[in-house]
């Protein structure tokens, strides 16, 4: 176990590897870098290198280290092993007091385990999410259980996440309800107008075409891509006055599975991954969202966009309870039925669009840094975030 010398600033190492991690860590990184009580070091594993480059450029975040671990077709075990091996010498050299990771990715788990093995305090941002099913999502449910187990401080987005941890006999003094930092990021980037690189998207937004935004990338959904793709094609035929926009994930397995299924319809628009600010603008201008992304389940309700979840379960049950999201499943019939019901029923749509997001107030990063200050002995925690419908 490391002990900080009197007078030295605590050093916080922040590790991320995918764009969703970076989106949620960005406001925390910026808060830490602007706080004179801390030193910081930022490490990217490059798990999703192309999407991360777009994000880092948008937020002017320059990692101190980039492991560049992205390899086509590598196994989870290979990625995990390479991440731990790459992080360990950096940890030894930098000697951080705290290692912070976010969510449930292979990178997040590798950072937590590498730090735990070095006796360093672990902070888990977005702790406490659970489906109760290790196979869904896979491997994320197992990853987050392991990360929380070795964490000294768990920054949870909601009371439900806190309750999940308390049911696992977690010390309540190690839990802080912050709200979700994705709301901090979303509110910041949506303040200014954005011009799309893709003129087709710019045209859709300017013409006020009703947009159905579709994203699907989860590992457990790869075998369901034909069902999801077929559902999108049928919906596009029935709702011909809507534009179905699919920014395809950079993962070749996702692109290879989905692109051939949806490429023929005139009102289906397939794009490359979008820079985060452009994606946020597209989300803001969408009518509904179909997604298996956890982050988008949190982001869309901030703009009053109903979410249909392309999964059989979700760890973000707060969205279901608040009425801002519904489970559409992964079977064609279920997806078509769920989307059709929402698009054909104005009162049903209004009820979802007018519900209040349970995920935050834009101050989650401030609460997070205050909690880290408390953990390292240079400050005090702030009161927990409380959702008021």
PLM-predicted stretches and their roles:
Residues 1-246, 251-389:
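Nucleotide-activated sugar donor-binding and catalytic core shared by glycosyltransferases
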């Amino acid at each position: 176990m490391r002990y900080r010398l009197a007078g030295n600033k605590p050093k916080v190492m922040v590790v991320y590897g995918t764009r969703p991690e970076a989106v949620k860590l960005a406001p925390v990184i910026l808060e830490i870098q602007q706080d004179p009580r801390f030193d910081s070091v930022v490490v990217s594993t490059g798990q999703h290198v192309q999407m991360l480059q777009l994000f880092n450029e948008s937020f002017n975040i320059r990692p101190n280290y980039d492991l560049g671990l992205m390899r086509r077709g590598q196994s989870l075990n290979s990625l995990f092993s390479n991440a731990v091996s790459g992080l360990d010498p950096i940890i030894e050299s930098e000697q951080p007091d705290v290692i912070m990771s976010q969510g449930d990715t292979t990178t997040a788990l590798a950072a937590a385990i590498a730090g735990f093995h070095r006796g360093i305090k672990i902070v888990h941002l977005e702790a406490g999410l659970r489906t109760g099913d290790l196979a869904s999502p896979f491997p994320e449910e197992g990853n987050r259980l392991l990360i929380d187990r070795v964490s000294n401080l768990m920054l949870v987005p909601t009371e439900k996440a806190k309750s999940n941890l308390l049911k696992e006999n977690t010390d309540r003094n190690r839990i802080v309800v912050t709200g979700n930092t994705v709301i901090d990021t979303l509110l910041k980037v949506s303040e200014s107008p954005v011009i799309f690189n893709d003129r087709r998207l710019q045209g859709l937004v300017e013409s006020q075409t009703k947009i159905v935004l579709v994203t699907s990338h989860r590992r457990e959904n790869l075998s369901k891509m034909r069902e999801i793709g077929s559902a999108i094609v049928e919906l596009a035929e029935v709702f011909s006055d809507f534009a179905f926009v699919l920014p395809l994930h950079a993962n070749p397995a996702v692109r290879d599975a989905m692109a051939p299924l949806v490429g023929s319809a005139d009102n289906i628009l397939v794009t490359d991954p979008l820079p985060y600010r452009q994606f946020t603008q597209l989300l803001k201008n969408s009518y509904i969202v179909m997604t298996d992304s956890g982050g988008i389940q949190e982001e869309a309700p901030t703009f009053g966009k109903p979410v249909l979840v392309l999964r059989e379960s979700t760890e973000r049950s707060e969205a279901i309870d608040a009425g801002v999201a519904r489970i559409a499943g992964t079977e064609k019939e279920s997806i078509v039925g769920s989307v059709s019901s929402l698009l054909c029923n104005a009162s049903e749509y209004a009820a979802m669009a007018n519900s209040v997001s349970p995920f935050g107030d834009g101050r989650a990063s401030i609460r997070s840094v205050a909690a880290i200050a408390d953990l390292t002995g240079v400050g005090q925690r702030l009161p927990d975030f409380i959702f008021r419908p």
